[in-house]
Amino acid sequence: MSVSELMQIKGIGKAKAVQICCILELSRRIAKQKARERLDFSNAETIAEYYMEDMRHLKREHLVLVMLDNRCRLIRDKVMSVGTSTGSMVSVREIFKEALDSRAASIVILHNHPSGNPSPSREDMKVTKNIMEAGRIIGVELLDHIVIGDNSYFLSLIHISEPTRP
């Protein structure tokens, strides 16, 4: 809930609404940090669940790079691009610079569709293919490209983009 939404509740002014938002955010961060330490990021569903609440209600498209070690444990993540309500731009070069700087063995790309529909666009498919090909050359595997929709929907693009994996 936002400060303005909380202020609509009788008896909650701006100061109290800000306090409540701060408490909610702190609780979310603590819970996420504890969960992060136990997660195996080799599973698309696990990754989608981990990022779902942060991404599904965003009004603009965000592309997140998830960098993993050789045991599929999270090294770090980074928002690589914030676009419009219909798209975002990021270069393959920027993605792999971050991955190499973090010494990632593999990566996962996530982005949200503000429309709530996780169906991939042609551009989503093209970007996935380009990142996959570059990763093969560089030696940093793209494990998945996940599209986050609304209402707990997500779509894994890795099998759509490459029907026959070696």
Which positions does each model-derived feature cover?
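Long, charged amphipathic helices and adjacent flexible linkers at domain junctions
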Residues: S27, A31-Y51
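Short acidic, glycine-rich surface-loop motifs adjacent to enzyme active sites
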Residues: A105-S115
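Alpha-helix-loop-beta-strand connector modules within alpha/beta enzyme cores
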Residues: V127-G139
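Histidine/lysine/aspartate-rich catalytic loop segments that bind and position anionic ligands
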Residues: Y51-S102, S106
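Conserved small/polar residues in nucleotide/adenosyl-binding loops
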Residues: I158-T164
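Charged helix-capping and loop-helix junction motifs
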Residues: S91-R93, R122-N130
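Surface-exposed, charge/polar-rich loops and edge strands
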Residues: S115-N117, E123, R136
